[in-house]
């Protein structure tokens, strides 16, 4: 049977198919202009002739029998077709040759390599369908994209795997979307929002177990913010809150309503005995009435949500105690109408939790901090430094934002860029432009530039002189040019469809084009 297949027209047809099919496959995977020749027999015939010579030499040198003949033919011809096509598409005009800088790969290519390298690692998380190496988890995640592009979809995919393997998490949860998806009372999950009937009641005084905890609490409630005239007044307000809160704790007055009254409404006569002998005493001097009024204005604005907590009828709750000994997930849900009142308090709770996580013994005690709208929340004081240190204590941060300018407005340009740099895993979805480039320009710069060698083909046609013999002739020339360009232009990022973007994991040198799927 083998003899009948390999002789005459049957043999030629089989050899042609063994070369041509892999050749066409390799063409379809390339991006070169040579695709237009895919139906031409010239290339396949040339490869077929070369492969035939190699097969003849191998058969003669091995003195092969029928079975070996079949093996040589069935292996050599397809390999010659496939790799010949890959070489042609790689080297042809219209296909850039990467020299250095940012590399981009297709989603399917990365999925194949991830599967090959990780082999279905038990408990491995995925982001956009791509496996996240365990060592990358503690290098934190940033997700950049405008509304509706898929940030929440990506976070749900990532956190679903984390919770399935027993990790704990804290969500700053816009509109309660993560609560609706993940809440499980049997797991010990907790809701924290003074406006939510299902919420526990935050006990501010339970966060104070050491003398220095008062300063930490004041810093969380009234962050320093960026440089400017307001920074000094926030410093005065922290000094005032620290002094009054410490005296209340020392005297056993653990009544949040009374603390709120002292901070915002008590007379100078009531306050003076409390702050005497503290750094806040000068604020109560007779010639400092206007200064005290300004300090109270800053304090009341920053701590406004504390006014609503005493009215709750719920079990007392400590964020620090939950980080040390709690179970499940802590949800901090908020509605759009509540954000003005809760912004500072949510940021304070996240800050308390992050710094308590760094007070634990070093080790991989997996705890996720998820902030889906970093640019909508207030300043989480110390976030920049915490991102650099949390990994030693098992902390993993997932930060999503729409606008880099809004993050810069909240944290200051320098700190905002440090926060971005400290998140080693990046997912970029569609971003908006604004005057000066906006977030799309920032995202393009984040992906980076690349240098490529670009082959450019020029076509020419010459015509014979008048009355001369011969027809016109066609000439083609190829020139190679070194080009440095943005790997992904800002305008490309602005035009991305929903659920489509670019992913880079911390341990991977290349960016991957990805498509998210709803879960």
Name each model feature, range by range.
Residues 206-211, 387-506:
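Conserved ATP-driven motor cores of ASCE-family P-loop NTPases powering translocation/secretion/packaging/pilus
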Residues 1-187, 250, 265, 273, ...:
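Accessory regions of macromolecular translocation/handling assemblies
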């Amino acid at each position: 049977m083998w003899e009948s297949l390999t002789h005459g027209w049957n043999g030629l047809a089989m050899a042609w198919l063994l070369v041509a099919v892999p050749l066409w496959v390799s063409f379809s995977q390339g991006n070169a202009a040579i695709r237009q020749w895919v139906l031409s027999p010239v290339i396949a015939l040339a490869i077929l002739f070369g492969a035939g010579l190699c097969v003849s030499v191998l058969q003669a040198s091995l003195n092969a029998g029928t079975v070996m003949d079949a093996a040589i033919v069935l292996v050599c011809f397809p390999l010659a077709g496939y790799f010949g096509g890959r070489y042609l598409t790689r080297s042809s005009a219209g296909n850039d040759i990467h020299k250095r800088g940012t590399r981009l790969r297709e989603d399917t290519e990365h999925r194949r390599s991830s599967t090959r390298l990780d082999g279905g690692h038990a408990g491995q998380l995925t982001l956009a369908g791509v496996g996240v190496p365990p060592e990358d988890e503690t290098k934190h995640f940033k997700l950049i994209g405008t509304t509706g592009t898929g940030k929440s979809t990506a976070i749900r995919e990532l956190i679903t795997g984390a919770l399935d393997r027993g990790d704990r998490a804290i969500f700053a949860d816009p509109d309660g979307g993560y609560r609706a998806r993940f809440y499980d009372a049997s797991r010990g999950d907790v809701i924290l929002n003074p406006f939510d009937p299902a919420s526990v009641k935050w006990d501010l005084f339970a966060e104070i177990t050491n003398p220095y905890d008062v300063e930490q609490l004041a810093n969380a409630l009234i962050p320093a913010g960026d440089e400017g005239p307001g920074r000094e007044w926030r410093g005065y307000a922290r000094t005032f809150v620290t002094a009054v809160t410490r005296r209340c704790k020392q005297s056993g007055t653990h009544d949040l309503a009374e603390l709120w009254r002292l901070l915002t409404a008590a007379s100078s006569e009531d306050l003076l005995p409390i702050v005497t002998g503290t750094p806040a005493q000068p604020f109560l001097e007779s010639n400092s009435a206007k200064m005290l009024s300004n300090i109270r204005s800053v304090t009341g604005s920053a701590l406004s949500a504390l006014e609503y907590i005493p009215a709750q009828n719920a079990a007392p709750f400590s964020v620090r105690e939950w980080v040390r000994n709690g179970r499940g997930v802590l949800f901090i849900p908020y509605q759009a109408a509540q954000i003005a009142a809760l912004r500072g308090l949510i940021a304070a709770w996240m800050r308390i939790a992050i710094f308590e996580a760094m007070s634990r013994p070093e080790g991989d005690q997996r705890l996720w901090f998820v902030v889906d709208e970093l640019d909508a929340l207030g300043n989480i004081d110390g976030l920049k430094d915490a991102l650099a240190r949390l990994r030693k204590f098992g902390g993993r941060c997932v930060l999503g934002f729409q606008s880099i300018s809004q993050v810069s407005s909240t944290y200051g340009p320098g700190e905002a860029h440090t926060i971005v740099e400290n998140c080693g895993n990046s997912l970029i979805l569609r971003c908006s432009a604004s005057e000066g480039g906006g977030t799309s320009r920032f995202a393009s710069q984040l992906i980076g530039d690349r240098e490529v060698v670009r082959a450019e083909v020029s076509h020419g046609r010459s015509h014979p002189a008048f009355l001369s013999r011969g027809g016109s002739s066609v000439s083609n020339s190829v020139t190679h040019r070194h080009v440095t360009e943005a790997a992904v232009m800002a305008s490309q990022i602005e035009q991305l469809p929903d659920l489509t973007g670019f992913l880079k994991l911390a341990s991977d040198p290349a960016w991957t084009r990805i498509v998210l799927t709803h879960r």
